[in-house]
């Protein structure tokens, strides 16, 4: 599939343009330089053609920040691999030395470049700046307003035409592969695990908590199976996050990623043990109706038996006792095969629909299995599975008012014990009164 990469200095509206082109808010957009750190990828579908669009960080000419240097290197690597580069400049404020630096680097790469003059709401201002813009040396250009959507269809027409001229194929594909989100507190090794799974340097890994701001996704194929892996920002306690900051927006994107994932890997630092924040994140994942695998990372740094650690973990978090626990060392790349096995198991459970006869049999056995339910004068007439992802069951009773949280937990337990374990996935129970 053809790849298009957005390039430019900081704060010219690259992420706003990215969000506009893919049709949803995926990259973080704020008026602060250096907001986008990781390379964000999205699929653009336009007039029955499609291409992969990449948003990169703002390119800084001179910086000593190790994170910005690492991201600049990643941006240049993306430019070299691109089929087409969208060089975004600010039509309102005009050209700066940073723009000239980016243009110089793009000319060295010698790729096809389309210059996108953003913030072009006022064309009289753009026309004043146009002579300086044209000195950057790129003949193909188009004025747009990413914020207001002006000229976006014309931009898409230009992109698809340029890709066709260069012989690049764009095509449609079905995103049927399971989406796996990697979440956890800052500095538990999420990005290291992400890179170990991909076996490539894709997300920026540094010892500074909070390096990954945007969700970063990548397709991976293992033993003929394809997965979409998503690395996310670390989630700290709300009380420690300043309002209206980049970190707050990053956490919001992480929550969105959890809610759009199929399986979530909750990464816990083995050297810290289970913390309150780990419990909060686990509860968020399961209450969002996502399948979950608990990953105990950095296990090579502790001297504890797996059996003992697992027992202690389930004591701290009994509400995840249906989830698989996998012990890993992202740095040493150990436990990764078992992790994929656990992902497969959780995803299969997440998508499973059980035979109706098993549910009918359970419904008939419940008065004997749980006399406590009968003592509440609650009668259960039928159990029916109506959905998957996650499995959802409608339970017909005489009076819905007689049910409570404990009734729900009891029914979930019996379904797991008598029908299917549903390892790794939460079960949704809905009670309905029989008319």
From Swiss-Prot:
Q: Which domain of life is it from?
A: Bacteria
Q: Carries keyword GTP-binding?
A: yes
What does this gene product do?
GTPase that plays an essential role in the late steps of ribosome biogenesis.
Give the UniProt record's GO annotations in the biological process aspect: ribosome biogenesis
Q: What is this protein called?
A: GTPase Der
Summary of subunit composition and partner proteins: Associates with the 50S ribosomal subunit.
> What does the entry list as the binding residues for GTP 2?
184-191, 231-235, 297-300
GO molecular function terms listed in the Swiss-Prot or TrEMBL record: GTP binding; ribosome binding
Q: Which organism is it from?
A: Pseudothermotoga lettingae (strain ATCC BAA-301 / DSM 14385 / NBRC 107922 / TMO)
Q: Which family does it belong to?
A: Belongs to the TRAFAC class TrmE-Era-EngA-EngB-Septin-like GTPase superfamily. EngA (Der) GTPase family.
Where does the EngA-type G domain start and stop, copy by copy?
2-167, 178-351
**Which key words tag this protein in UniProt?**
GTP-binding, Nucleotide-binding, Repeat, Ribosome biogenesis
KW Nucleotide-binding (keyword) present: yes
Q: Which Pfam families match?
A: KH_dom-like, MMR_HSR1
Domain named KH-like: which ranges?
352-435
């Amino acid at each position: 599939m053809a790849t298009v990469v957005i390039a430019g200095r900081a704060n010219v509206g690259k992420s706003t343009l990215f969000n506009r082109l893919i049709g949803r808010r995926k990259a973080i957009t704020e008026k602060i330089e250096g907001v986008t750190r990781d390379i964000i990828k999205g699929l653009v579908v336009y007039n029955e053609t499609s291409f992969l669009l990449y948003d990169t960080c703002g390119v800084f000419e001179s910086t000593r920040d190790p994170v910005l240097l690492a991201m600049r290197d990643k941006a240049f690597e993306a430019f070299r691999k691109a089929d087409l580069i969208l060089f975004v400049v600010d039509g309102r404020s005009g050209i700066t030395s940073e723009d000239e630096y980016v243009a110089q680097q793009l000319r060295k790469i010698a790729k096809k470049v389309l210059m996108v003059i953003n913030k072009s709401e006022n064309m009289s201002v753009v026309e004043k700046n146009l002579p300086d813009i044209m000195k950057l040396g790129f003949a193909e250009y188009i004025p747009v307003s990413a914020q207001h959507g002006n000229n976006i269809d014309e931009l898409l027409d230009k992109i698809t035409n340029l890709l066709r001229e260069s012989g690049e194929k764009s095509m449609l594909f079905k995103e049927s592969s399971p989406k796996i989100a990697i979440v956890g507190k800052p500095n538990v090794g999420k990005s290291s695990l992400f890179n170990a799974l991909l076996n490539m340097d894709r997300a920026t890994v540094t010892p500074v908590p909070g390096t990954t701001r945007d969700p970063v996704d990548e397709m991976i194929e293992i033993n003929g199976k394809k997965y979409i892996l998503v690395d996310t920002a670390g989630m700290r306690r709300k009380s420690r996050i300043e309002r209206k900051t980049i970190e707050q927006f990053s956490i919001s994107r992480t929550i969105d990623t959890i809610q759009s994932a199929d399986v979530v890997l909750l990464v816990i630092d083995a050297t810290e043990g289970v913390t309150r924040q780990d419990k909060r994140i686990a509860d968020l994942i399961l209450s969002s109706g996502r399948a979950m695998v608990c990953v105990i990372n950095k296990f090579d740094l502790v001297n504890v038996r797996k059996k003992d650690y697992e027992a202690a973990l389930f004591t701290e978090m009994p509400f995840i006792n249906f989830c698989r626990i996998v012990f890993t060392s992202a740095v040493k790349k150990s436990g990764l095969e078992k992790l994929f096995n656990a992902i497969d198991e959780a995803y299969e459970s997440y998508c499973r629909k059980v035979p109706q006869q098993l549910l009918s049999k359970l419904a008939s056995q419940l008065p004997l299995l749980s006399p406590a339910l009968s003592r509440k004068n609650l009668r259960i007439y039928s159990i029916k599975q109506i959905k998957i992802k996650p499995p959802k069951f409608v339970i017909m009773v005489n009076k819905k008012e007689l049910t409570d949280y404990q009734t729900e937990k009891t029914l979930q337990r019996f379904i797991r014990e008598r029908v299917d374990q549903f390892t790794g996935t939460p079960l949704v129970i809905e009670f309905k009164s029989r008319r």
